[in-house]
Amino acid sequence: MAYPEWALKHKIKNSELRKRGNQYALYSITSRWCPEKKRTKKVTLKYLGSISEEHGFIPAGMKRKGKIPTGESPYKVPPETDLKETNFMDDLAELNDERSARNIEHSVSEILFTALCAVICGADGWQDIEEFGKTKLEFLQQYFAYDHGAPSDDTCRRFFRAVDPGEFEKRFRDWIAKLSKIDKKQVIAIDGKSSRHSFDGEQKMLHMVNVFSTESKIILGQHKVSEKTNEITAIPEILEWLDVKGHIVTIDAMGCQYAIANQIIQKEGDYIFSLKGNQGNLSDDVTLYFEKEVSLTENFFVDYNKEHSRIETRKCWVIHDVKWLTQMHPHWVSIKSIARIESTREIKGTTTIEYRYYISSLQETAQTMLESIRGHWAIENSLHWVLDMSFFDDQSRIRKGNAPHVMSILRHVAFNLLQLVKTKRQSIIGLRKMCGWDEKLLESVIARKSS
């Protein structure tokens, strides 16, 4: 539809003109994701005012009060500028907006972008996000309009409480799938983590099962469970969307289930499971075999490590002849090897020895098995410890509605973006501070392109 020049000059970004007789009404609009039609749909936010050839723009309510303005419109037409792009907002910004359409002043993109940049730069709560937005408004306006300034802490709080975490998780996975394509064989660790201060009244603390690439050191996805014991039900759901073809999936004893093992094999992946006493006599049979039957020279590898006045020795034995074990436990037909790791630690003259046992669908050397298992152990230092000590995940008191879950995912987005640009000698917490000080560095982090 062609609009007259006198009406078009009052049209602003994210608005729409609608003809009313010899005048035009101006509405602010946005778009929302429609899950039924699987596309975005236009949504009217609010009536801004009317436009006539004689009087120009008349803001909503002024005509009712008998006031007809003269001069320029109070709604300034922003200059035509090329806004900068980020690699993640295309995937995250089309979230279904659950807020009431009345009085909405900030788009989904503006709130998400403010919160993410704030978290990257060290923000931990709603007030931090608001203060960051006010301080860095000129920087943020390089990416989005922010016609009403930075979102307040109450705006962020209401928005994140209402976001559908399931939809947000899926958009996170879509983004990370484009950001980091895993081509060569590597270890994918699945392990749970609790945010201990996220409880509130009857609402239990948040427990997330995280999927972590041990080589690229990025989070591939996550799944919320009500408590740690429910990891068993969460892992099969994770494996539904996780591409494990050609990779090694490592899971601790909680997830050592033959149904999970079969699911990984069906998806053309391999597994290494830690053994404990949750599978009947399986753990006892493997332990007894290593204690009485194994030759100390058969498929053996030893690794030494010395640092901080601590000497660690790890010995690994792997047995490929496991036909006897699959006959005793017919549900576990996918087992192709068993392993034992002896960890000896010497600290200031005190020596401790620990034994761990594993089952696997791999037929690899002891060295490869040990390296893969150590990759799984690294999830504690490379992910969980960083989330607690650098993002203060364990101390977060965001606890109402869906906000703990959604903010946990947002911290994962920030973690991945920082992980992709940090050097070996940099710490994540130091890099967060530097992003807050140096806008060029922050720009390089959020402009990280898909591979």
Q: Where do the protein language model's features map onto the residues?
A:
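Dynamic "connector" segments at or just before major functional cores
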Residues: M1-A189, S198, N210-Q222, P236, ...
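Short, flexible loop/turn motifs enriched in small residues
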Residues: G21-Y24, D200-H207, T351-T352, I379
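Short, conserved catalytic/metal-binding motifs centered on acidic residues
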Residues: S28, T114, I129, S152, ...
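Conserved beta-strand -> loop -> alpha-helix junction used to position metal-binding or nucleic-acid-contacting
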Residues: K46-G49, G269-D285
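Generic secondary-structure signature for well-ordered alpha-helical cores
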Residues: P165, E240, E291, S295, ...
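Polybasic low-complexity intrinsically disordered regions
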Residues: K178-I251, C256-G269
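An anionic, glycine-rich sequence signature occurring as long contiguous blocks
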Residues: K276-G375
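A C-terminal functional module that forms or caps the active site or interfaces directly
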Residues: I338-L418
